[in-house]
Amino acid sequence: MPAEILSELPLRPAPRDIKIPNAMHNEERRHKHSRSSYSEMSPLMSRNNSLTWRPAKRPMPTPDKTIAVINAAGRQAASFIRVATAVGFHVRAQMRNLEGVVATEVSTNPNVTVLQGELYTKETPAESDKGQCVDVTKNGPISGIGVNDALISELFRGAQLAFINTTFYGDEERIGMALADAAKKAGVQHYVYSSMPDHHAYNKDWPSLPLWASKHRVEDYVKEIGIPATFVYTGIYNNNFTSLPYPLFCTDLQPDGSWIWQAPFHPNAKLPWLDAEHDVGPAILQIFKDGVKKWGGGKRIALAYEMLTPLEACEVFSRGVGRPVRYVRGPIEVKVKIPEGYRIQLEALEELFNLHNEDPEKQPPYFGDIELERSCPRAALELWEGPRGLEEYAREVFPLEEQANGLTWMIEEYDGGGGNNIGNNHNNHHQQEEHYQHQNGHQNGHNGINGHIVNGGVDSESEEEDSDSDDEGLVMRGNKRADEEWLA
């Protein structure tokens, strides 16, 4: 039934369309880009209005080069592979095995071709030698241990670039030279080698650190054969710190929830620091992007983003983790089974950073070359300006790595170290130094072990074992990095 019109209500005519000059159509007003601040003739209109025609997008340039990388599950290599493949490089990566989170990450990366195997070979043992293990971590030539030339040759097939960080598994010097020879034969255009110093070459009074001296000799060989090369020297890894009983960088968890770091370094001598997992990759990538024109000719680059004394390192680490961290200058304690080659390295390191030296100015430069050390962190920041410092690492990453390694302190209640204030009690350099002096004197007077590796109950004369053994003691067994090369 039609609605009844009440005569007492006034009738209103339907509204007319009001025409406004230059008004937009309704459908245009509804579009999110229709109210552009640019005129229709503006060349920027196509950037601000999706209704206008725009040319097809140009494809992003993708690197067409392949990079050869060894020890791909190690900290330096894995960091580099992440960033290099993210921007389109292809990587040919050698790995000892495919076990662990990092190896899985690398091997499942679509831009990575994995070559699984050792860089060394072992001869079939004679009948009289069967059942005996060979320690493949010793410095220098090892009887029965050779170089896997077939794998090395295959690694460089089709590669134009190379990032090489050798380790002490096998004869590092022979392997390093074989890698350089293969790279030259393959026509590699830029060879970046992760080197370290031979301190004895800089000062005859300084001992060589065997595992570093091997790298130094490989560096000399790379220069000798004329590959376009750059050499990077990495500082102390932030992520070396662990509550697990590994030597040199063990942060020993105390009953009150604090930590003690004991090492032979002078408490007031500056040391270079680097977050290997976060910062090596971007820095190496920039070296390749800049090319040999800028970084070739055998240039050395110190990769370190902070110069901190042990006392300063403990201070910033304490701020990050929220608990007291104290430094004790003392001998390196070895409480787990370690490869013999690494044991020899630690003994030499104690001799180099002499516990009896009371003058921080007399401590040898970590990188051997004082000028290289003075370039920190300027040279590294020229490559990568977004580093993760030790404090940030301690706050954001250290608890996660500790939990992945089976530790639980981060989820347990912490009473603040018996009510002591962290800032007042442990961020004061003078109080830390008093603690260092007391501890050092105690060990000298009672233990009689100053300047020597503390055996920790491990028989150094025990039968040498192959590095493949699951009982090395230096392979983290947690989920986070079960396969990472120690200090690689």
Swiss-Prot record:
Acidic residues bias: start-end ranges:
460-473
* Highest taxon listed in the record's lineage: Eukaryota
A Pfam family that the UniProt record links to this protein: NmrA
- Gene Ontology cellular-component terms listed: nucleus
Composition-biased stretches, type Polar residues, lie in 36-45
Q: Where is this region: Dispensable for NMR function?
A: 412-488
Q: Which UniProt keyword terms apply here? A: NAD, NADP, Nucleus, Repressor, Transcription, Transcription regulation
Q: Where does NADP(+) bind?
A: 71-76, 165, 215, 237-240
Q: Where in the cell is it found?
A: Nucleus
UniProt-annotated stretches for the region Disordered: 1-45, 422-488
What is the disulfide pattern of this chain? none
Question: Residues that bind NAD(+), according to the entry?
Answer: 75-76, 165-167, 215, 237-240
Give the family, as the similarity comment puts it.
Belongs to the NmrA-type oxidoreductase family.
Q: Tell me the subunit arrangement.
A: Interacts with nit-2.
Q: What is this protein called?
A: Nitrogen metabolite repression protein nmr
- This chain is encoded by the gene named nmr
